[in-house]
């Protein structure tokens, strides 16, 4: 699977994540509320909650914070009713973009997302305009460390049911089907591995190469979207220039 670098900016992205950790914890807290309302507070019987907890741990959310969020969600009988919406559209140079939101006010969210698109030369589209360009996949990203053998890790992941294993720059990336994500993640967790990322994502079927000028404009659009409290995930098919940094 060469021809594009999906993981080249993981470390730069991780630095930004560190700077925005409080906002990320708030967003994950909203996901916990939705998961608990749908399937209850027990991770043993609630697969969606297990997935959110894995995402929380990959983002270094402390265990006591996770537990408090679950208790708070299970105790709030009149908790805010969040609606899940996915907006679709095009960034600069026709980049395909999906934006997942969890919101208690869809008019506010729609306006904010539309503004982010149009400000940088993109535009929101109708439902289905770009979603066919993506597949739902489980993705687990593991930092390369001394003592972590690549071949052993690859066999571990593939034996557990992973579809693909890649080694790139400073990380290993494991891709799974949506259905097998939990099984593979738990198998790797059982080996004591820690993750930089562990979640189900919309992965593009193909990537669109962009130049530095477009990358700069598109990054501004991504920053506005990711800074919005209602936006949970942003997926796109842009291939950033080699060596380009945010």
Curated annotation (Swiss-Prot):
GO terms for biological process: regulation of DNA-templated transcription. GO terms for molecular function: DNA binding. It holds the Pfam family Transcrip_reg. The keyword DNA-binding applies. It is found in: Cytoplasm. GO terms for cellular component: cytosol. Keywords: Cytoplasm, DNA-binding, Transcription, Transcription regulation. Belongs to the TACO1 family. This is Probable transcriptional regulatory protein CBO3073/CLC_2975. It comes from Clostridium botulinum (strain Hall / ATCC 3502 / NCTC 13319 / Type A). The lineage of its organism: Bacteria, Bacillati, Bacillota, Clostridia, Eubacteriales.
């Amino acid at each position: 699977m060469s021809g594009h670098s999906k993981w080249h900016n993981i470390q730069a992205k991780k630095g930004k994540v560190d700077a925005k950790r409080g906002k990320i914890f708030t967003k994950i807290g909203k996901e916990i509320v939705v998961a608990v309302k749908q399937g209850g507070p027990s991770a043993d019987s609630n697969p969606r909650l297990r997935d959110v907890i894995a995402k929380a741990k990959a983002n270094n959310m402390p265990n006591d914070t996770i537990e408090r969020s679950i208790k708070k969600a299970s105790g709030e009988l009149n908790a805010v009713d969040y609606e899940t919406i996915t907006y679709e559209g095009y960034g600069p140079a026709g980049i395909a973009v999906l934006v997942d939101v969890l919101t208690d006010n869809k008019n506010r969210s729609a306006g904010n997302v539309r503004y982010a698109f149009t400000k940088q030369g993109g535009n929101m589209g109708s439902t289905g305009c770009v979603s066919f360009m993506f597949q739902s996949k489980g993705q687990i990203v593991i930092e390369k460390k001394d003592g972590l053998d690549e071949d052993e890790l690859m066999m571990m992941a593939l034996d557990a049911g992973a579809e693909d294993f890649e080694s790139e720059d400073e990380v290993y990336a494991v891709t799974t089907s949506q259905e097998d994500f939990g099984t593979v993640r738990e198998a790797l967790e059982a080996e004591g591995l820690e993750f930089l990322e562990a979640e189900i994502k919309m992965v593009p079927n193909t990537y669109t190469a962009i130049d530095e000028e477009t990358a700069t404009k598109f990054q501004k659009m991504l920053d506005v979207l990711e800074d919005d409290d209602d936006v949970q995930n942003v997926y796109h098919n842009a291939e950033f220039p080699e060596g380009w940094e945010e």
